[in-house]
């Protein structure tokens, strides 16, 4: 049974290749959802210095708290050339455990987030407790998200607008 067939739980995962607009889509949906729902969660944004990506920050969508998630460097835990800042995991954990949340935004379900010791547990708690979740899912974690009940939409530049419409319709929002 998909989220299209059940009203009580909405778990949408947006996946796709880098640069197709997954985070942009989630931010647009969040902007519109705030007028109707109590939202929670986190988004991950690139940090650039002189046009070069040097890392990622995590932003709690409720408080606006912004913390470094990862930076280029050496050390552990790491994902590729990025070292994950474990204290940022607390912001992610709090964002997923927010009380009275009607729609959670998770950007993203991916390797850096899984370096956080409690991420999978926090994610499972959110899936059990929050009625609607919109998440970006790294392509290597699609199977993990599907096991949690997410229906995956593969985003491309060509289907960006129709995917936005699909997600907004699922949330009973209009553009």
UniProtKB/Swiss-Prot annotation:
Catalytic reaction annotation: a ribonucleoside 5'-triphosphate + H2O = a ribonucleoside 5'-diphosphate + phosphate + H(+)
EC number assigned by the record: 3.6.1.15
A Pfam cross-reference name: NTPase_1
Annotated InterPro entries: AAA+_ATPase, Nuc-triphosphatase_THEP1, P-loop_NTPase
Entry GO MF terms: ATP binding; ATP hydrolysis activity
Top-level division of the source organism's lineage: Archaea
Keywords: ATP-binding, Hydrolase, Nucleotide-binding
Positions of ATP binding: 16-23, 103-110
Sequence similarity: Belongs to the THEP1 NTPase family.
Entry function: Has nucleotide phosphatase activity towards ATP, GTP, CTP, TTP and UTP. May hydrolyze nucleoside diphosphates with lower efficiency.
Official protein name in the record: Nucleoside-triphosphatase THEP1
Taxonomic source organism: Pyrobaculum calidifontis (strain DSM 21063 / JCM 11548 / VA1)
């Amino acid at each position: 049974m998909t989220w299209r067939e059940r009203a009580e739980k909405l778990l949408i995962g947006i996946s796709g290749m880098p640069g197709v607009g997954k985070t942009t889509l989630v931010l647009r949906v969040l902007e519109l959802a705030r007028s109707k729902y109590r939202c929670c969660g986190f988004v991950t944004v690139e940090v650039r210095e002189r046009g070069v990506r040097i890392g990622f920050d995590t932003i709690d969508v409720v408080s606006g708290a912004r913390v470094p998630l990862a930076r280029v460097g050496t050390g552990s835990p790491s994902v590729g050339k990025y070292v994950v800042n474990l204290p940022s995991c607390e912001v992610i954990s709090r964002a997923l455990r927010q009380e009275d949340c009607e729609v959670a935004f998770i950007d993203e379900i991916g390797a850096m987030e899984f370096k956080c010791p409690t991420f999978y547990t926090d994610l499972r708690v959110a899936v059990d407790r929050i009625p609607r979740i919109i998440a970006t899912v790294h392509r290597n974690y699609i199977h993990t998200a599907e096991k949690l009940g997410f229906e995956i939409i593969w985003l491309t530049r060509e289907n960006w607008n129709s995917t936005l419409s699909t997600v907004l319709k699922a949330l009973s929002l209009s553009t």
